[in-house]
A protein has these predicted regions:
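Short acidic, low-complexity intrinsically disordered linear motifs used
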Residues: 275-295
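Acidic, proline-/serine-/threonine-rich low-complexity intrinsically disordered repeat tracts
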Residues: 255-277
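Surface-exposed polar/charged interaction patches
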Residues: 20, 24, 246, 290-293
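Prokaryotic Sec-type signal peptides and long signal-anchor helices
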Residues: 7, 207, 290-291
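Charge-rich, solvent-exposed alpha-helical interaction surfaces
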Residues: 17-20, 239, 243, 286
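Compact mixed alphabeta submodule
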Residues: 130-260
Length: 295
């Protein structure tokens, strides 16, 4: 726009400026909450309690899905919060970078790899039987994200360790069992060790009309492992470079490959959801939205 145009249109831009300001304000207050996902409420001490019923898969599908993601802040001040392509059996640039860092033989590089390692998540449908801190959730079907500790408890129900224990499918309407989620704060992290299954019983007293009503509310789990919902390798590598900076990624990708080519690549163990503090989890949930807006 020329100076003459600016002069001629003086005063007429105020409405555009007001609209832009209002748009900015509204974007700052918009919700980042996915109402489909149930999250436990904890008190000031970090303790919480709820009773859940794990629900079966829809149309004969497995009742849970597993995926990995990465969540870390780079030296640029930007966040990298993206699903890992390893969730769908593909090579992921962060995984490649972490392997190179780990193989560099430099301890500080290993520390970087640890802070950037994968986070493991499971997702399933649950019916909230009891939620004392948020009773409005009771009687509703939600998606529930959890980590390895809770998954191990589910697996142990289906594959008991001792011969005198009967296997229980916790996802079964008629022969499953309620799950008593007990959360404690142990050294700043959420601990689920006290959580346990109740004795097996028929869900909702086995009333078929109610069971069918719950079944019809099941959320689709395939979105979490649908390749269409994952960025491409090149898109992720571009984002990674932006977050870590050109120098950081360039240095890591030029480790002496001729020396390391035939060396075994040690796996960097994924961090589970339980190994994150509740504050870290909430922070990453918020910044994941901001990270997407930066792209």
């Amino acid at each position: 726009m020329s100076f003459e145009t600016l002069k001629r249109n003086r005063g007429s831009n105020i409405n555009k400026i007001i609209e832009a300001a209002q748009s900015t304000n509204s974007s700052e207050t918009k919700s980042y909450v996915d109402d489909r996902i149930w999250k436990p409420t904890v008190d000031k001490a970090g303790n919480g309690y709820a009773v859940l019923r794990f629900l079966p898969g829809k149309d004969g599908e497995i009742p849970f899905v597993r995926y990995w993601d990465h969540g870390f802040k780079g030296p640029t001040g930007l966040w990298y919060i993206e699903n890992s392509l390893t969730s769908i059996g593909q090579t992921d640039p962060v995984g490649e970078l972490n392997s190179r860092l780990w193989n560099s033989g430099i301890e500080s590089d290993k520390d970087k790899a640890r802070t950037q390692k994968r986070r493991l998540h499971y997702v399933t449908n649950v019916y909230v039987v009891s939620d004392p801190s948020a009773p409005q959730n009771e009687g509703k079907v939600f998606l529930y994200k959890f980590g390895k500790k809770i998954f191990d408890k589910i697996y142990d129900q289906m594959n008991p360790e001792f011969a005198d224990e009967t296997p229980v499918d916790p996802f079964d309407f008629w022969e499953g069992a309620n799950f008593k989620l007990k959360i404690r704060n142990v050294e700043g992290y959420r601990n689920y060790d006290k959580s346990e299954f109740a004795s097996p019983d028929q869900f909702l007293a086995g009333e078929e009309a109610k069971l069918e009503g719950v079944y019809n509310q099941l959320h689709d789990l395939t979105e979490f492992t649908n390749p269409k919902n994952y960025k491409t390798y090149d898109e992720l590598k571009t984002k990674l470079t932006k977050v870590l900076g050109e120098t950081a990624t360039a240095g890591a990708y030029t480790v002496k490959e001729e020396v390391k080519l035939n060396d075994p690549v040690p796996a960097v163990e994924p961090v589970t959801a339980e190994e994150m503090s509740s504050e870290d989890e909430d922070t990453l949930s918020y910044f994941s939205k901001l990270a997407k807006e930066d792209t």
